[in-house]
Amino acid sequence: DVKWKTINLYFANKSGDALVKNSKRICYNKNVSVEKVVMEQLIKGTTESGCYQSIPSNTKLLSISVVDRICYVNLSQEFATDMVNAKSNVTIYSIVNSLSGLEGIDGVKILVKGNSNLMYRDAISLDTVFYMNNELVKKDLSDN
């Protein structure tokens, strides 16, 4: 059985200093959680004009679950060590905003190989729950 759903994915803009919202209609197996589908789409990236890869494409999603309205995203080491042309906060909030937009999810906790006690790119502590941040989102694609 499949389900159809429109999701909002947040990718980096061309300069990597802001997020671009990309609405997408997806078809997925109802045995797979929509948050897993969202993360797979973010990792895969997009060909949409004005949207650029925000997460290293060889990142692996090790696990994802929702407990008490917090989505726990456990990613492989590549997430922390491989680079994309996006500022640290853009990468973090591409995940947070994409998942926080889903029903039943208020916040996001990011782990790397099960560990959240680390600094992402020496800039952002992962030892916290992140919430939607609309300040990073470009309102107009022509701003790229």
Regions found by a protein language model. Give the residues of each.
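Bimodal "functional hotspot" detector
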Residues: 1-144
